[in-house]
Amino acid sequence: MSVIDHVRDMAAAGLHSNVRLLSSLLLTMSNNNPELFSPSQKYQLLVYHADSLFHDKEYRNAVSKYAMALQQKKALSKTSKVRPSTGNSASTPQSQCLPSEIEVKYKMAECYTMLKLDKDAIAVLDGIPSRQRTPKINMMLANLYKKAGQERPSVTSYKEVLRQCPLALDAILGLLSLSVKGAEVASMTMNVIQTVPNLDWLSVWIKAYAFVHTGDNSRAINTICSLEKKSLLRDNVDLLGSLADLYFRAGDSKNSVLKFEQAQMLDPYLIRGMDVYGYLLAREGRLEDVENLGCRLFNISDQHAEPWVVSGCHSFYSKRYSRALYLGAKAIQLNSNSVQALLLKGAALRNMGRVQEAIIHFREAIRLAPCRLDCYEGLIECYLASNSIREAMVMANNVYKTLGANAQTLTLLATVCLEDPVTQEKAKTLLDKALAQRPDYVKAVVKKAELLSREQKYEDGIALLRNALANQSDCVLHRILGDFLVAVNEYQEAMDQYSIALSLDPNDQKSLEGMQKMEKEESPTDATQEEDVDDMEGSGEEGDLEGSDSEAAQWADQEQWFGMQ
């Protein structure tokens, strides 16, 4: 048994640190005496040494050693006869089982992706002839092409993966995300569905995610619910996570939180989707829950973007925007495709007044998730913050046409129309349409209330808000109702509404300001009663508090968010 065989056995046993030390010494010996090992043996040493470096995450060093190994392999292929080794008395047949050159190139590409050098990774994998590409090589190529915006070769590579592995579900999702029709994708899996038992759900699964990637949230929800109700797929964490995300996109925060909680109970180590869950909790003012969630996720893994995003949400809603910016940047560093991280960083930049930088991040989020409305909302808010109403209007109209006329797109367009006095009536019409579709949609209710406040139609606003609060409890709605009640001199109930708002979100500054303002004032009834008491006591002193007409508390702009639902 040769020394190379020992190195190979240690590598197979996972003794990477041992392989690294021994192979380093043997390579130095080979450099000092080129006759010590044959070309094939040196090739093996270089590959095993590079593998150990890869395991230690020294990717640049590993790439250089893989490149040297490939050069050695070229020299080996030109050598018709293996030179005898002076360092080993015999060469077993096992020692001639050389590491695959294709596998070396794949590992090399992996190093490049870890170093964020995607073009170099593509170049290495492109150098492998199509017929020699394994499914994992095609999968990596497909993902790299997709990331680079090269849709056609990406589709081709995904299809090649499915040709070899028809149950590669992530490849199916990749094709659907590139606008390949669900029927075409389903046809590529038909044979396996018909021949393998208990796979009748797969065609429905493909149909559901086809709806997801076309932005048809309601049909996607219904289809996944039908899957989730089947006994064999009940309580599947991935399906629950998808449902939670779809409810989030559809603006149904309540059901989204419920599904995230259900998935989390089934899998306490779940990370995927927890960034959205943390954002929803932060938006509801549940900052203590957000902090606990962040700590739990960091204990699971700090090498994923989600824990950093959750912690960033806590900072953002605590108005610590610089820290939120740092945490968002850290999340992007770990996963450049994290949409929620891009939205967090963009929102922090916007609130810090760095609008142009924020715009770049929101545009990247749109590129990665063209069906997510919150990405467009962040960009439109930046346009409005910089008084670029025309750009905001163009974007809102494009979203309306692309994603269809639903309550969310109607409200988004109305939000922009409210910024221009000329389009106030159009805003009113759009909001009425949105509320006709979803009477409890919070963003639409808030904007309609804003419009009624401008027109001083407080009674209409109170009726609107009471109706919206009939089946839900929302901090912003309770606070605005309190503002409207102050405007019609209903002080006691206004105080009650502010109290409810603060119970839902103790950090809601506007509710606190409204309550403090009321405490400093006194209603006319109380003032009269105080004067009567003074007269009865014959004090002759007049109350020093004058009754005043309280105007509606200025609730102004609705709260900042980096994902409007």
From Swiss-Prot:
TPR repeats: 101-134, 169-202, 203-236, 237-270, 339-372, 373-406, 407-439, 442-474, 475-508, 509-531
The keyword Acyltransferase is assigned to this record: no
Subcellular location: Cytoplasm, Cytoskeleton; Nucleus; Cytoplasm, Cytoskeleton, Spindle
Pathway listed: Protein modification; protein ubiquitination
One Gene Ontology term from the biological process aspect of the record: protein K11-linked ubiquitination
InterPro entries hit by this protein: TPR-like_helical_dom_sf, TPR_rpt
Region (Disordered): 513-565
UniProt-listed Pfam families: TPR_16 (PF13432), TPR_8 (PF13181)
Key words of the record: Acetylation, Cell cycle, Cell division, Cytoplasm, Cytoskeleton, Mitosis, Nucleus, Repeat, TPR repeat, Ubl conjugation pathway
Keyword tRNA processing: no
Example of a GO MF term: enzyme-substrate adaptor activity
Compositionally biased intervals (Basic and acidic residues): 513-523
Observed effect of gene inactivation: Mice lacking Anapc7 show growth delay around weaning, although birth weight and adult size are normal. They show sensorimotor dysfunction in locomotive assays, as well as defects in the regulation of short- and long-term memory retrieval of the contextual fear response. Loss of the protein does not alter the anatomy of brain regions.
Biased composition (Acidic residues): 528-549
Residues bearing PTM N6-acetyllysine: 229
GO cellular component: anaphase-promoting complex; cytoplasm; heterochromatin; intercellular bridge; microtubule cytoskeleton; mitotic spindle; nucleoplasm; nucleus
SUPFAM superfamilies: TPR-like
Family note: Belongs to the APC7 family.
Function in brief: Component of the anaphase promoting complex/cyclosome (APC/C), a cell cycle-regulated E3 ubiquitin ligase that controls progression through mitosis and the G1 phase of the cell cycle. The APC/C complex acts by mediating ubiquitination and subsequent degradation of target proteins: it mainly mediates the formation of 'Lys-11'-linked polyubiquitin chains and, to a lower extent, the formation of 'Lys-48'- and 'Lys-63'-linked polyubiquitin chains. The APC/C complex catalyzes assembly of branched 'Lys-11'-/'Lys-48'-linked branched ubiquitin chains on target proteins.
SUBUNIT field: V-shaped homodimer. The mammalian APC/C is composed at least of 14 distinct subunits ANAPC1, ANAPC2, CDC27/APC3, ANAPC4, ANAPC5, CDC16/APC6, ANAPC7, CDC23/APC8, ANAPC10, ANAPC11, CDC26/APC12, ANAPC13, ANAPC15 and ANAPC16 that assemble into a complex of at least 19 chains with a combined molecular mass of around 1.2 MDa; APC/C interacts with FZR1 and FBXO5.
Full protein name: Anaphase-promoting complex subunit 7
Source organism: Mus musculus (Mouse)
Classification of source organism: Eukaryota, Metazoa, Chordata, Craniata, Vertebrata
